[in-house]
Amino acid sequence: RFENETIYHELGHFLAFVAGNVDRTSDFAAVYNSEKSKFTGINRSYATQNSSEYFAESVLEYVTSPSTLKRQRPKTYAAIVAALNKITDERIQRVMDIYGPFWS
């Protein structure tokens, strides 16, 4: 187990949000439904309770064991890569413009 697992999980939620709530799309729901049974992490019941927690736990695995994720759940791996590719300077700026005052 990695010391910083919780932060990677929470960053997974943040990635999903900044990428356009990708964890709540019908496309990701299809990935979730087809691959959640293949999730083998110790937080299995928590991680597979809904698509948002599954995405966040999968980001944790993407960071800590990407080759395992890619081999065992290739659609999930591809969805995370797609989410990362949606992060643009414009999206980051929009989030900063909206939420910046709360973070100051």
Locate each region found by the language model.
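Active-site-flanking segments in enzyme catalytic domains
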Residues: 1-104
